[in-house]
Design a protein with these regions (language model features):
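ATP-dependent carboxylate-amine ligase
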Residues: 2-143
Length: 143
């Protein structure tokens, strides 16, 4: 248990990136069970959450599983939630049905730019994370 608590990053997951004053912590969720687990990891003290979903072949193009995820873990007074990604509109509908008002942005980088400076929790599915990491690495001079 002590070893697990000391893990800070695994293949980009849980990594923190400073993007123009926004400290974005990245979390990857690839299936309903992963999304449920990610919901428990959202820091309750953070006022901004970006959730991104793409629908490419590696993600699975059928996003009906969104309705199996309990998104209530991100819902709290004063928190801003931004849905994004290729299937951001589908995600926004799902969040609204869960009672979570959200804004909509085309891409995770756009969603992050729409946030106020400070901490931001960023939950993304596989290709949304992959594409976002490419942009982050470029911005940080890693690629």
């Amino acid at each position: 248990a002590a070893a697990v608590s000391s893990v800070t990053e695994v293949a980009g997951r849980y990594s923190v990136h400073d993007v123009n004053g926004r400290k974005a912590r990245l979390m990857l969720a690839k299936n309903p069970a992963g999304w449920q687990e990610a919901m428990t990891m959202v820091d309750p003290r953070v006022d901004q959450v970006v959730i991104g979903v793409n629908g490419q072949v590696p993600d699975g193009q059928d996003l009906s599983w969104l309705w199996d995820v309990d998104f209530s873990g991100v819902n709290r007074p004063g928190r801003r939630v931004i849905a994004c990604g290729e299937r951001g509109a589908d995600l926004a509908v799902r969040l609204e049905y869960a009672g979570i008002h959200c804004d909509l942005a085309p891409l995770p980088m756009d969603a992050l730019a729409a946030c106020e400076p400070g901490r931001v929790e960023v939950l993304l599915n596989y290709t949304a994370m992959r594409d976002f990491k490419v942009l982050l690495d470029r911005k940080e001079g890693k690629r």
